[in-house]
């Protein structure tokens, strides 16, 4: 009877048991696979985290593998490439890069390098280090030693070569990782260590009797018996920096190498004010794509004899090999100059000092001739793989293309960490003027010209393997604000075939970390962006130099250029000029002047709140007098929230923009300038619950993207969970370009209600490729987009139809859109002005020059104007 009951029970619940077993098996599989899942990558490494435990490092890896594996592509033909490569390229990554590269020159460059690598004539196979090795001799066998499971003879690093182990392979790996000793065991195992094996553990050679899996003619230890070899290097110990200079020591002079990008001119001026002294040198490299910064900073050369801009400029993309090329070129320029200097320190506009210049000079004077770099602080082999040092990268078309795996040269130690360094003049002279007979340096230069993030490893590796190794100090003088969960989002995939990380901007909440630098040999912090947060910079300045007075003018204001009429104009400025010209016309009409030329657009923030952008333009009065005006404009998006919905009551900052920065959780298109080629992103803040006892809720929502014709163009499914803290979320849409110009609607809906609705403007274009649209075909190409992004077989849910226009309404609006898409000249301008006037508010205006008889305040007296006094960024004050 009991058996029959059991049988019935098993038959009844058999499907349930099978499902439970499957779920358990899947969980085990996922747990196993998760061991190898990495975090984010690169720019670097979190060198400040080097003191963490190995357990923490293992659970929070620094750099992720490439974002996706590549399928095996088909071979490329000469017709596809536009030329005949010199070999039949085999590497799948190289073929993929060739398929994606846009220009023929770039494809030829990739193919040439890929063929050279394939032929084995590109990289050096073996190099010889010139760092003193003490009493260690390469490849010397010390014999067979007894090992213990709980107390390894060589405990520095372990790996298992299942099919290829040999003493030589293990020696190469251990030397590369910086270990003086290598050991092979049990046929497949390789161990590395720093400590000399004890004589008491010595065994007869016959105890090591297992053949190597990679070479059966050689012996690779035994069962808990290890063949140990010397790698030929001594244990490396970084130098300890002195804290105070000896009495009577000559004070060093510093060459500050500023590598500048973007448009944050006032922050560059502010950095120069904090660092400036007549005895030091300030050499500035401005990215070759940044006309505005180069033009404005060039003015400093006439005022300051020790400030000079680099004439040979590079496009320094994230992770690019050009960054190392640029640094070496600038260092060479400094060596050729008349200036006398002892150290070069590279900084960006995102750096700021955390100690006074005098303290930095004292510290470096105590450490003359030493070189300050920050190592990765973790296992070298993991660093090599996560950093992509075992891959070849080629830079062209402002992109870093991954073209295949590579084997690093044997015989050298590999090191790396941060690309922010402080280098002595003798070392700079060595790396910038390699002698032909210096095979090591020549080979390393070639290696790192085809390396991702090369400046993060080049200087470290050269120091470790040359006669300069005794000058290595493991400190790059920086504290960096790493927040891995935010900073490692693979946000650089558009410029590099790899996943990358960046440090976060310092915020007021990070102040304790800045305060903690006081007793450490740290002199700079990064990153700072006043357009994200200026309050922390003010706090830092007051900590260093004393409090600002209450009368200090415009202390909490910040201005940053968006557009300047002297810039080289191309397609990137078409949208800005289209909207800017419209706002100029609207502001001119309001002031009763005839607008002539759009001069500048400038972002304005006060107390870290965005107050809009400033439109500066020239105009002519009815009397014939020429004047310049500046108008503050606030972008507006018209939103509605459901009044009675619990979710809507906690919804904030519901807006559509572009350039959403996941790291800083903000859309960097502050002016909300959206056009037919924009990649739209909706972002919002869901406020945390203040009632700890309230029941938790979750919401499954749908975001509808509705075009000016009332058609559904795309939708996103959103899942929002309750939280005790504010959550910033974003949702991208995939629309077909060009997007239809006009008033769009984003609706956030549930099953039966609308939670939020937002109307936003996709502005028509008045320019194309930097030139005004003058013909109907040109206008239709930019403003005539009427396509549908959804697939043809998409079935519209019945409950969504209430949010869209009827077919008749869509037909009528389509005819209107077709006509508008053909407009040029004044009719086009009137269409744009009508739309822009609804989504941008003209708040206030000022006049640049006195004596115009306009009833407007002078811009120099208007605290919001870009012409208002800004003493905190007034670099001319250094001349007084």
UniProtKB/Swiss-Prot annotation:
Pathway field: Glycan metabolism; chondroitin sulfate biosynthesis; Glycan metabolism; heparan sulfate biosynthesis
Transmembrane segments: 15-35
Predominant localisation class: endoplasmic reticulum
Matching PROSITE patterns: WSC
Function (record text): Catalyzes the first step in biosynthesis of glycosaminoglycan. Transfers D-xylose from UDP-D-xylose to specific serine residues of the core protein.
Organism: Drosophila pseudoobscura pseudoobscura (Fruit fly)
GO molecular function, one term: protein xylosyltransferase activity
Classification of source organism: Eukaryota, Metazoa, Ecdysozoa, Arthropoda, Hexapoda
Cofactor note: Divalent metal cations. Calcium or manganese or magnesium.
Recorded catalytic activity of this chain's protein: UDP-alpha-D-xylose + L-seryl-[protein] = 3-O-(beta-D-xylosyl)-L-seryl-[protein] + UDP + H(+)
Cellular localization per UniProt: Endoplasmic reticulum membrane; Golgi apparatus membrane
Cysteine pairs bridged by disulfides in the record: 87-115, 131-469, 488-501, 490-499, 846-859
Glycosylation site residues: 135, 139, 346, 700, 729
The protein's required cofactors: Ca(2+); Mn(2+); Mg(2+)
Family of the protein in this entry: Belongs to the glycosyltransferase 14 family. XylT subfamily.
EC category: transferase
Lumenal side stretches: 36-880
Record keywords: Disulfide bond, Endoplasmic reticulum, Glycoprotein, Glycosyltransferase, Golgi apparatus, Magnesium, Manganese, Membrane, Metal-binding, Signal-anchor, Transferase, Transmembrane, Transmembrane helix
Name recorded for this polypeptide: Xylosyltransferase oxt
Signal peptide boundaries: none
InterPro entries: Glyco_trans_14, WSC_carb-bd, XYLT, XylT_C
Biological process according to GO: chondroitin sulfate proteoglycan biosynthetic process; heparan sulfate proteoglycan biosynthetic process
Binding-site list for UDP-alpha-D-xylose: 287, 316-318, 419-420, 502, 526-527
